[in-house]
Amino acid sequence: MIEESGNKRKTMAEKRQLFIEMRAQNFDVIRLSTYRTACKLRFVQKRCNLHLVDIWNMIEAFRDNGLNTLDHTTEISVSRLETVISSIYYQLNKRLPSTHQISVEQSISLLLNFMIAAYDSEGRGKLTVFSVKAMLATMCGGKMLDKLRYVFSQMSDSNGLMIFSKFDQFLKEVLKLPTAVFEGPSFGYTEHSVRTCFPQQRKIMLNMFLDTMMADPPPQCLVWLPLMHRLAHVENVFHPVECSYCRCESMMGFRYRCQQCHNYQLCQNCFWRGHAGGPHSNQHQMKEHSSWKSPAKKLSHAISKSLGCVPTREPPHPVFPEQPEKPLDLAHIVPPRPLTNMNDTMVSHMSSGVPTPTKRLQYSQDIPSHLADEHALIASYVARLQHCARVLDSPSRLDEEHRLIARYAARLAAEAGNVTRPPTDLSFNFDANKQQRQLIAELENKNREILQEIQRLRLEHEQASQPTPEKAQQNPTLLAELRLLRQRKDELEQRMSALQESRRELMVQLEELMKLLKEEEQKQAAQATGSPHTSPTHGGGRPMPMPVRSTSAGSTPTHCPQDSLSGVGGDVQEAFAQGTRRNLRNDLLVAADSITNTMSSLVKELHSAEEGAEEEEEKMQNGKDRG
């Protein structure tokens, strides 16, 4: 008992799953019932993966399950309905790539429970064939024109006239879909639904039916149907326009432009929910846009329209012939003919080995006439397929195809059963078959060798693209040179560091010496000031020279000694700027300049070593690539 109650709860949860997910989308906040109904049914269509199945795949599934041979009022059980739905989704997965496979079991469960909730509210466990066809043809993907053509073929007689009673039955079935998504008060079936579609009781042909259903606006009871198709077309349309209410920088889907407010545009979410701001009101007329045109395109279109260069608008659908196509009578097109041998065109050989013509050769002259008959049959079918892109689902057409296939199968079976060949023909055919088998074996061997070569080349390419330590050891000479270059580079860097340290120490010593010289000069100046024999030219002291910033590191002390002292303290530069009064200053200047020259040569040597190392690395890498 506990298990049974648990299974019942699980079954009820599965039945309510689709409706729970639909309520979670919060479609009820949409203000207009037409958009609300279309959004709900579009959600059901995508959730059940019906948008991946077009009307032609549905017709094929109906034929595979024998629904085209049943009367519209025939009732089928839920188990058979599940079989039909299973065949639809399993065939769909065969057509889809492996990366886009769907969950077949989940899709079957969702669609089956939705159809039972919509068409078997009384719980009888049976649905009519017409209900199944109407629902699946309406909810599947594909073009609306193809769907309406198929629906009309199910409601018309042999003369191509619509039967109003069947159209009324179609409205009853298709309007159960809005009722199933809780929109029955807006789009439920009434007795006057047929009159709203066709007010005048007259003969309705295919073109008139298509004109009415695809008109703008369509019949009131079916206004949600073309809107659902438009929703599918504009789901991924991008509009680089800012919404005037929510200030979203861009829009996806529909775009609505007010006809009264200047440059007032709303995204579909704001328009569906009735949002308005500023001078705009919900009572203003809005224009729906399903695409975006730049101002340049609008201007060019306006100019072309004013000049009369715009082509006339194409009709919403092609014009189809008023009279339906007459079924082909296969008894006259493929008349029965005497059963003949497949080898009647061969020449029989006598025991002497001399080829002698017999009645087989005479019969070979009649073959062109039979081939002409078959070619005429094929040409007629090709013409029909060119005129009608896809043969509609009708029992008479299926019976003709079955009769044609059965006749050809019987002919081939009889020809295969009544074959009588002379021994010479059998031996000749045996030799030919043997040669063919040998040729096939040779081709298979060549194919196998080619595949092995392709696999070998692929492995070599993978090994070449992924270098390993073993491969790196294949050229020890290059590795040794690279190792020496790196070692030399390290040594040069260490030497440069040591020279920089020595330069810093020398600069410190220079600073100390210059301080001593400056102090000595100050003492001498003080003594000269205090002595009465001091010359008056030395009484006022001397001005301090301004430091000079160096722009060259390689100048000699005889031309511009200040250029050699860039980077040292101001005291050093000041001392050397006063002239060459002492040998100590000259010695210091020469030492500083030699340090600078040594550093320059070291830097150049280091750069040349680095460039050489880079060239060697490139050579080694090129050698690896060629290897």
Swiss-Prot record:
It comes from Homo sapiens. Residues 428-529 form a coiled coil. Keywords: Acetylation, Cell membrane, Cell projection, Coiled coil, Cytoplasm, Membrane, Metal-binding, Nucleus, Phosphoprotein, Synapse, Zinc, Zinc-finger. The coiled coil domain may mediate the interaction with dystrophin. Scaffolding protein that assembles DMD and SNTA1 molecules to the basal membrane of kidney cells and liver sinusoids. May function as a repressor of the SYN1 promoter through the binding of repressor element-1 (RE-1), in turn regulates SYN1 expression and may be involved in cell proliferation regulation during the early phase of neural differentiation. May be required for proper maturation and function of a subset of inhibitory synapses. The keyword Disulfide bond does not apply. Zn(2+) 1 binds at residues 243, 246, 267, 270. InterPro entries: Distrobrevin, EF-hand-dom_pair, EF-hand_dom_typ1, EF-hand_dom_typ2, KCMF1/Dystrophin, Znf_ZZ, Znf_ZZ_sf. Belongs to the dystrophin family. Dystrobrevin subfamily. Pfam families: EF-hand_2, EF-hand_3, ZZ. Highly expressed in brain, kidney and pancreas. Residues 549-565 have a biased composition (Polar residues). The modification Phosphothreonine is found at residues 11, 69, 179, 212, 424. Induction: Post-transcriptionally repressed by microRNA miR-143 during neural differentiation. This is Dystrobrevin beta. Gene3D superfamilies: 3.30.60.90, EF-hand. The modification Phosphoserine is found at residue 394.
